[in-house]
């Protein structure tokens, strides 16, 4: 509520200086040349790319190969949407107990399970959505862990690290999704191979 500005006092008394464009470019360069940053940022980027690619391709599979309408697909898409909610909830509950790195190891197991399911399952709505649910459950676990690990050593450069991590997600996911679709990604089993490839890389 905008009226809160008049009811509460500002608690931040010291303001940080706005970095110059040259300093920001140096920070971005340092991040891109850091093995630590790139290791965990790439996990975030590829997991996000996998979600974007699936969101791009799955409606085509459901509508073109099964004959489903857009309204019907919107209802079925609630199933994988629950995967993201479930993944982040599980992550928030268990991660404080076992730590980021151990939690992150759950993702390859879920992704390989999703890949095997999508490769062998019949092309029917429920089966396809279960495969997508498993995959996005893994994404929901991986993304918060990777983001937390990316930010850990960069408390003094939190803004630059967050911007590079988030911006990289959008750029990489767009390029990956566009490339895969242009290469002919249009079947559920194609998607399963992509999941296996991304799992092997990360």
Where are the regions a protein language model picked out?
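Juxtamembrane intracellular "pre-TM" segments in multi-pass secondary transporters
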Residues: 9-40
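Short amphipathic helix-loop junctions that connect adjacent transmembrane helices
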Residues: 56-71
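C-terminal transmembrane helical hairpin of 12-TM major facilitator-type secondary transporters
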Residues: 101-146
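Pair of pore-lining "gating" transmembrane helices in MFS-fold secondary transporters
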Residues: 33-53, 133-134
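Helix-to-loop junctions at the C-terminal end of transmembrane segments
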Residues: 86-100
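A late C-terminal transmembrane helix in Major Facilitator Superfamily
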Residues: 137, 147-185, 189, 194-195
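Small-residue hotspots at the loop-to-helix junctions and early N-terminal turns
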Residues: 70-78, 162-163
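Transmembrane alpha-helical segments of major facilitator superfamily
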Residues: 75-84, 169
């Amino acid at each position: 509520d905008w009226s809160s500005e008049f009811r509460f006092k500002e608690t931040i008394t010291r303001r940080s200086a706005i970095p110059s464009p040259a300093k920001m470019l140096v920070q971005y360069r340092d991040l891109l040349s850091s093995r630590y940053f790139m290791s965990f940022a790439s996990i975030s980027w590829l997991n996000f790319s996998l979600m974007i690619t699936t969101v791009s391709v799955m409606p085509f599979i459901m509508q073109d190969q099964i004959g489903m309408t857009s309204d019907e697909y919107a209802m079925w898409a609630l199933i994988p949407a629950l995967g993201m909610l479930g993944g982040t909830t599980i992550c928030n509950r268990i991660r404080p107990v076992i730590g980021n790195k151990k939690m992150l190891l759950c993702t390859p197991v879920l992704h390989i399970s999703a890949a095997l399911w999508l490769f062998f399952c019949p092309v029917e709505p429920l089966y396809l959505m279960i495969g997508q649910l498993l995959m996005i459950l893994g994404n929901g676990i991986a993304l918060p862990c990777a983001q937390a690990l990316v930010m850990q050593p960069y408390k003094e450069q939190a803004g630059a690290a967050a911007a590079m991590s988030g911006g990289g997600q959008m750029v990489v996911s767009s390029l990956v999704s566009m490339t895969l679709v242009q290469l002919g990604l249009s079947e559920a089993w194609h998607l399963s191979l992509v999941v296996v490839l991304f799992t092997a890389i990360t």
